[in-house]
């Protein structure tokens, strides 16, 4: 459970910050307090998650989160590594392997670290009902979003891991769906966190559905089994749940040098993000936040030093939090049945105290 993995520190009231007296001072303060995060295409999950970061964490002149539209996880990694105006970005657990294959890059693991493992992005395959399983798409025309997107990389790798060779096409998702309707494509692929907005808004009629892609035992450990249910996509999943694959998303960060202005503002971001994480679990935020475990490690990745320091400082408080949870459970005459219900009741109890 996300919020039970660490206890969040109480906020310390800050002293008033004097207003800058010159235009140059104003610019310096704005740059020193603004953290940019590269997200994804409009309407996508990364775009919505980036907006949540801004809504929750923006705090006047102390911290501003500035979401930037991006192509997705594949291109985001290059943006984090090379663009001076990009501090953070949503990338995937298979992203470092993608960058290692680029012979132009050196020691990529030293430049891109992660702050937290977030959630899983599921493989979605939209195709006509005649396509019963992913194997039926062998040799067919399949769209993998725009070149450089997360779907372009992860989706292609997933198909290779599944042993299905296709004729890969790169077009944007709205165009791909229109091509699918017209018979110019055999399937449209999206690797994104469910529910995906452009998929939920797609009207399949009686022609299209989400194709199952069962998890094979031989697949890379970067990918995990997942499922898509009628609750996720009522129009596209009729009857049985669809088995599929998923890949993890992490909040990547440029590994800035300690003592720099960029490093110090990222320290403030980490403190705010971890310390106010409960706010991301509110009903108006994306449901994928509820999958997050802030303390989870990611194989092959190095955690950004300020994030690791924050977790280390709060380990003792985590023990205290467990004791507090025990006290809460003793107050419950009728204990909620599910983990999520327990956690939501616990949050209300703690806020009331």
Where are these regions (language model features)?
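Pocket-lining segment of extracytoplasmic ligand-binding domains
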Residues: 93, 103-104, 164-261
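Pocket-flanking alpha-helical
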Residues: 54-55, 66-107, 177-179, 195-203
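Segments of small-molecule ligand-sensing domains
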Residues: 244-351
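Extracytoplasmic
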Residues: 30-34, 44, 60-62, 72-75, ...
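Signal peptide-directed extracytoplasmic domains
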Residues: 93-130
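Signal peptide processing junction and immediate N-terminal pro/mature segment
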Residues: 2-21
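Bilobed "Venus flytrap"/periplasmic-binding protein-like clamshell domains
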Residues: 34-57, 65, 121-178, 182
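Extracytoplasmic small-molecule ligand-binding "clamshell" domains
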Residues: 33-38, 42-89, 239-241, 342-345
């Amino acid at each position: 459970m996300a919020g039970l993995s660490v206890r969040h520190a109480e906020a310390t009231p800050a002293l008033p910050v004097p207003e800058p007296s010159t235009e140059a001072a104003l610019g310096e303060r704005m740059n020193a307090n603004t953290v940019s995060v590269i997200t994804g295409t409009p309407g996508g999950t990364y775009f919505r998650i980036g907006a949540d970061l801004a809504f929750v964490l923006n705090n006047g002149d102390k911290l501003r989160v500035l979401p930037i539209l991006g192509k997705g996880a594949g291109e985001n990694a290059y943006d984090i590594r090379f663009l001076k105006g990009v501090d953070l970005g949503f990338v995937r657990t298979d992203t470092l392997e993608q960058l290692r294959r680029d012979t132009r890059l050196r020691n990529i693991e030293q430049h891109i670290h992660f702050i937290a493992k977030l959630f899983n992005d599921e493989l979605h395959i939209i195709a006509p009902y005649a396509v019963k399983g992913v194997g039926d798409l062998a040799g067919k025309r399949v769209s993998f979003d725009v070149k450089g997107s997360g779907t372009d990389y992860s989706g292609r790798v997933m198909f290779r891991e599944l042993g299905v060779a296709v004729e890969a096409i790169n077009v944007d998702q709205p165009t791909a769906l229109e091509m699918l309707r017209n018979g110019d494509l055999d399937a449209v692929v999206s690797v994104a966190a469910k529910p995906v907005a452009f998929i939920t808004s797609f009207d399949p009629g009686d022609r299209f559905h989400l194709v199952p892609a069962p998890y094979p035992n031989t697949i890379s450990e970067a990918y995990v089994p997942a499922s898509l249910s009628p609750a996720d996509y009522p129009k596209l999943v009729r009857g049985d749940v669809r088995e599929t694959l998923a890949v993890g998303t992490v909040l990547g960060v440029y590994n800035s040098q300690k003592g720099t202005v960029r490093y110090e503002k990222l320290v403030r971001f980490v403190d705010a993000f971890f310390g106010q994480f409960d706010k991301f679990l509110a009903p108006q935020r994306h449901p994928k936040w509820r999958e997050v475990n802030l303390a989870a490690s990611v194989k092959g990745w190095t955690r950004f030093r300020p994030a690791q320091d924050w977790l280390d400082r709060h380990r003792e408080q985590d023990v205290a939090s467990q004791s507090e949870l025990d006290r809460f459970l003793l107050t419950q005459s009728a204990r909620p049945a599910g983990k999520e219900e327990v956690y939501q009741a616990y949050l209300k109890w703690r806020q009331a105290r």
